[in-house]
């Protein structure tokens, strides 16, 4: 969804309480918010509950949405904050479950050239990503999977842009070391 489309949906919600707009937001953003919540709480049921709660809260506070500048970032921050609230309530540590995150492989946009990359290559890349530290993995997935800008990731995670850059450099270096360069250029 484009940022303009998300802005339009937020406007429809805030001005007229358009139920179709909340349904469309839910349909378009549920999976991304769920993945973020899951990466924080490490529990599928809790992540689903948290994600649904985000949309309930958006609906309840819809009159305040007119002032939101970046709806996508706002939704991600809501999911992150709700997940952290959940952890505080459960008195749990923030975790990323390496085993369970296999349920969320990176989605690759496939061009004809990329079709030549073997499933072994994709498996190698995903294996490297799974071996990244939890923080590095989260930063990498937010940039590459969620298509967030470094500034947005920094704001979302309350870290500096330099930290985002450093984590991305670590991830990309490890991937490039594990994957032959001939495959990366196709």
Where are each of the predicted segments found?
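N-terminal module of bacterial RNA polymerase sigma factors
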Residues: 1-32, 113
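C-terminal edge and immediately downstream basic/flexible tail or linker adjoining helix-turn-helix-like DNA-binding
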Residues: 2-3, 12, 95, 124, ...
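Internal acidic/polar
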Residues: 3, 93-115
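Sigma70-family region 2
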Residues: 15, 55-70, 90-91
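Short, charged helix-capping/linker segments at alpha-helix termini
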Residues: 15-23, 35-51, 184-186
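Structural recognition of an alpha-helix C-terminal capping motif at a helix-to-coil junction
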Residues: 35, 49-56, 69-81
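Arg/Lys-rich amphipathic alpha helix in sigma70-family domain 2
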Residues: 63, 80-97
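Helix-turn-helix DNA-binding module
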Residues: 127-130, 134, 138, 142, ...
């Amino acid at each position: 969804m484009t940022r303009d489309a998300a802005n339009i949906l937020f406007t429809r919600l805030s001005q007229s309480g358009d139920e179709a707009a909340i349904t469309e937001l839910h349909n378009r953003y549920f999976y991304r918010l769920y993945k973020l919540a899951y990466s924080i709480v490490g529990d599928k049921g809790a992540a689903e509950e948290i994600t649904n709660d985000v949309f309930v809260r958006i609906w309840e506070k819809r009159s305040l949405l007119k002032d939101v500048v970046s709806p996508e970032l706002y939704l991600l921050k809501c999911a992150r904050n709700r997940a952290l609230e959940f952890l505080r309530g459960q008195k749990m540590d923030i975790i990323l479950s390496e085993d369970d995150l296999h349920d969320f492989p990176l989605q690759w946009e496939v061009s004809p050239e990329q079709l030549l990359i073997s499933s072994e290559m994709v498996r190698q890349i995903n294996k490297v990503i799974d071996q990244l530290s939890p923080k590095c993995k989260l930063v990498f997935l937010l940039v590459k999977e969620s298509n967030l800008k470094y500034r947005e990731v920094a704001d979302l995670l309350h870290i500096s842009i330099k930290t985002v850059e450093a984590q991305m450099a670590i991830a990309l270096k490890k991937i490039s070391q594990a994957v032959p360069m001939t495959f990366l250029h196709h």
